[in-house]
Amino acid sequence: METLFNGTLALAGRDQETTGFAWWAGNARLINLSGKLLGAHVAHAGLIVFWAGAMNLFEVAHFVPEKPMYEQGLILLPHLATLGWGVGPGGEVIDTFPYFVSGVLHLISSAVLGFGGIYHALLGPETLEESFPFFGYVWKDRNKMTTILGIHLILLGIGAFLLVFKALYFGGVYDTWAPGGGDVRKITNLTLSPSVIFGYLLKSPFGGEGWIVSVDDLEDIIGGHVWLGSICIFGGIWHILTKPFAWARRALVWSGEAYLSYSLGALSVFGFIACCFVWFNNTAYPSEFYGPTGPEASQAQAFTFLVRDQRLGANVGSAQGPTGLGKYLMRSPTGEVIFGGETMRFWDLRAPWLEPLRGPNGLDLSRLKKDIQPWQERRSAEYMTHAPLGSLNSVGGVATEINAVNYVSPRSWLATSHFVLGFFLFVGHLWHAGRARAAAAGFEKGIDRDFEPVLSMTPLN
């Protein structure tokens, strides 16, 4: 099937003759060499953690405390700040040392992982089954595979509980909704009611509902992690103690490539959900660090000009816009008072700077006339001018704007990158699922090389 370009590159047990895969097929050569595959995975983890540590230190070195994080192209420090490290009231950075510590810890960890990866790739045993049966496996061994699945689930559950412990006991996390403009606080009364937590999963994904992406208080987020961590840990114990049922043995393909396809499918779903979360959610991804969401920037613009024109004498409750609808305020189909104009489509935005001006029926006209605070005006003007729009050449804002600034929101980068990676992972899922099913059905060899059309064509040279 494959062409070997250079036989001298081959290593024992990893060449085309013994594995059926050439050097460029990567880890496919290691499908049946558990020791070498371990080395590849540990080394890969080392590269990932090295990037995290190095990029972390790079961001610390370039960080300017006087500017918001989202103006500095940062994607790692906002995550650390959201976890409550180094920030105070209003999301102001008061100490960058925790960020430095995080970078150094990741660099040190990556050195350990790098050593382990090189050791297992070059020096360690080719296979683990003989010497270390606990760590050895055969891809067809369904019982062993579900045990490995269980161990992974327990580790994921522990990860979820790490966030819970940080929020409850280790200094708390940043809450953008804290009174007075956001602050780090310990989460005391978790939401553990299953009807609330699982109610998110049953919501519609569309406007005004927003599925799990609509979560807007930290009690629910941390409570959700308690539920998820518990489910992962108990599910992990279950999978370690049990063997797959007959229906699962029949329904699933039990091969290394099949497991790869399942994993890629799961990661793809994670990528798409993360994309929606970082784009729309300003509680898990506070606007103080990531910049405003798209709807938030749009509503902020409407609010900013409502404030300006009200000062100039406009009656914002009755002014008509060019379409005959309200220029500043209008009613949604269900009767709430919402901002008028193009931003009406973002009527369901919730943001800490806007909610104090709402009453039981949407925006409260008397509060808009009497209660707008200077901090709300400043915040909305700032968000209006930092919309998560931007082109590849890093000129942010609306594409036709002549006074554009050199700004692209981290929200744009994080949402776009997770969408693109989620898509690639989905294609990889389809590819490997197709190959795994074909192999299980016994026709994985592909097209017949003896009658390939290219063989009857004139050579290129």
UniProtKB/Swiss-Prot annotation:
Residues 1-2 form a propeptide. Its main location: plastid. One of its GO terms (cellular component) is photosystem II. [CaMn4O5] cluster binds at E355. It comes from the Eukaryota. One of its GO terms (molecular function) is metal ion binding. SUPFAM superfamilies: Photosystem II antenna protein-like. It holds the Pfam family PSII. The modification N-acetylthreonine is found at T3. The modification Phosphothreonine is found at T3. It is a multi-pass membrane protein. It is found in: Plastid, Chloroplast thylakoid membrane. The chain crosses the membrane at residues 57-81, 122-143, 166-188, 243-263, 279-300, 435-459. Keywords: Acetylation, Chlorophyll, Chloroplast, Chromophore, Manganese, Membrane, Metal-binding, Phosphoprotein, Photosynthesis, Photosystem II, Plastid, Thylakoid, Transmembrane, Transmembrane helix. InterPro entries: PS_antenna-like, PS_II_antenna-like_sf, PSII_PsbC, PSII_PsbC_sf. Gene3D superfamilies: photosystem ii from thermosynechococcus elongatus. Binds multiple chlorophylls and provides some of the ligands for the Ca-4Mn-5O cluster of the oxygen-evolving complex. It may also provide a ligand for a Cl- that is required for oxygen evolution. PSII binds additional chlorophylls, carotenoids and specific lipids. Belongs to the PsbB/PsbC family. PsbC subfamily. One of the components of the core complex of photosystem II (PSII). It binds chlorophyll and helps catalyze the primary light-induced photochemical processes of PSII. PSII is a light-driven water:plastoquinone oxidoreductase, using light energy to abstract electrons from H(2)O, generating O(2) and a proton gradient subsequently used for ATP formation. HAMAP family: PSII_PsbC_CP43. PSII is composed of 1 copy each of membrane proteins PsbA, PsbB, PsbC, PsbD, PsbE, PsbF, PsbH, PsbI, PsbJ, PsbK, PsbL, PsbM, PsbT, PsbX, PsbY, PsbZ, Psb30/Ycf12, at least 3 peripheral proteins of the oxygen-evolving complex and a large number of cofactors. It forms dimeric complexes. This is Photosystem II CP43 reaction center protein. It comes from Gossypium barbadense (Sea Island cotton). The gene is psbC.
